[in-house]
Amino acid sequence: MKTAGGAVALVRNFSGLAREFKDGELFSRMLETLSGEAYFAGLANRLEREKITPVFYGGEGYPKAWLTLADAPLCLYAKGELSLLKDELFAVVGSRRTVDSARKLGGKIAEELTARFAVLTGSADGGDETALRGALDGGKAVCLLAGGFGFAPKENPLLVRVEKEGLLLSACPLDTPVRVFSYEYRNKLLAAMSVGVLVLGAAEKSGALITAKYAAAMCKKLFAIPYAPSVLAGAGCNQLIKNGAYLTETANDILEKYGYEGVEKKKIPLTETEEKAVEFITERGEAHVSEISSALNIPTYRLATMLSALEVKGAVVKLGGNRYSVV
């Protein structure tokens, strides 16, 4: 109420603001700038120069789900493959501290989801980044920034790739910096424009849970990757599952909820010894190098080479402390 009262007072006394700015000098300059053609001509030239397409409220390509939001942006700025706005969007998000095994799995799921959806995510390190890479490999990646294009890190090779191969979006004016509150608003928009959300990793208090909160409030399907109870970086995911989110281990767990046929699992060519190693790790969930070496009777120096090969093939992922799990 204090904020609203301040805003009301500001509007009521707006005419008096001119006197505060050197008898209206600054006010007049602002009014002149916005009233003249030069400002808008400069903006149009910048949009064309930077290959940014404005998508206006209610216009073609504007997310229909945003039209129901009281605080919907008046304009969506886009760079890249605009046709992806016509696809069904599925959001895959995760905290910066998403563990390696979940990131590996999340990237694979994101890639396979592109068989039916365009995958939507943010641009943060960790879960968002791995989802973005997987979606790019699948050919349908959409990234929604928290700030304006003027503040997007131009040296970020991943975002450059999104511009060229996917679609980069911003709901903010070009030179809007990222503030603390920017992420929650972005996450709300992300949840609204997607048909569902998968959370790859989230502690008890994580930005990824904000996206999940809005998705649940909007009656979107919610999915989460399960974690061992001892992994604090996944406590938020486990809580989502307890609260009704779908436990997710493969892309098929998601696709089937939308009535789509599952993606056929690719057979990874393995040697007999590699198959035994994968089987051993699978039975235990994860295993230390010494345990695998003892079970297969293979010296650790030889095993290290084999495990590296299995990582390259996408069969296993290395965890901390010389431990491995299957993908």
Question: What do these predicted ranges mean?
Answer:
Residues 56-327:
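Glycine-biased, small-residue-rich flexible motifs in mid-sequence functional cores and linkers
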Residues 1-61, 224, 315-327:
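Short, small/acidic-rich helices and loops at N termini and domain boundaries
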